[in-house]
Amino acid sequence: RFKKIRRLGALPGLTSKRPRSGSDLKNQLRSGKRSQYRIRLEEKQKLRFHYGLTERQLLKYVHIAGKAKGSTGQILLQLLEMRLDNILFRLGMASTIPGARQLVNHRHILVNGRIVDIPSYRCKPRDIITTKNKQRSKALIQNFIASSPHQEELPNHLTIDPFQYKGLVNQIIDSKWIGLKINELLVVEYYSRQT
């Protein structure tokens, strides 16, 4: 993890740790001139590691975004941001996306009153995300919400009620609220040149 954040910069979905400011300087000195391919590859890796996806999963999302109407890069980011594991992370119900994925896999999370154990479940506007009524599920979420550093900077498309352990998806995310500094066009270019 630390090698990844040292090389690619801050990845809030992967870890709350930040790269040291001196390591950026060393990387720039060591790397010399970066090729266009390397720049595109690093943006793709940043996206992959932040959302915790395999190469195949990311490629699948790129294909879906390519078939949809509109900007492929924007649609790709919307698809990734509307995943259940990412929504839990953005709500502050988990400290990282892998942590959110574990909550979903262990069946602690309900969407609209039904247990969902698929982290890649695509949330829609007006979805209500809650925890199971079990004490253990509520305790896990309560700990995350209490220690969540990004509670006050909740994106516009989400609302949380920390006392009822309930989150609401208001709308599809606007590109201004993406929680990662990324140039999505470079990611799309990377995949368009691979085929």
From Swiss-Prot:
Location of the S4 RNA-binding domain? 82-143
Q: What is its main location?
A: plastid
PROSITE patterns cross-referenced by the UniProt entry: RIBOSOMAL_S4, S4
Any single Pfam family the record assigns to this protein: Ribosomal_S4
Origin: domain of life: Eukaryota
Q: Which UniProt keywords apply?
A: Chloroplast, Plastid, Ribonucleoprotein, Ribosomal protein, RNA-binding, rRNA-binding
- Residues spanning the membrane: none
Q: Which GO terms label this protein's molecular function in UniProt?
A: rRNA binding; structural constituent of ribosome
Q: Name one GO biological process term.
A: translation
PANTHER family assigned: 30S 40S RIBOSOMAL PROTEIN, SMALL RIBOSOMAL SUBUNIT PROTEIN US4M
Q: How does the annotation summarize its subunit structure?
A: Part of the 30S ribosomal subunit. Contacts protein S5. The interaction surface between S4 and S5 is involved in control of translational fidelity.
Q: Which family does it belong to?
A: Belongs to the universal ribosomal protein uS4 family.
Q: What does this chain do? A: One of the primary rRNA binding proteins, it binds directly to 16S rRNA where it nucleates assembly of the body of the 30S subunit.
Name of this protein: Small ribosomal subunit protein uS4c
Q: Which organism is it from?
A: Gladiolus murielae (Abyssinian gladiolus)
Could you read off the lineage of the organism from its UniProt record? Eukaryota, Viridiplantae, Streptophyta, Embryophyta, Tracheophyta
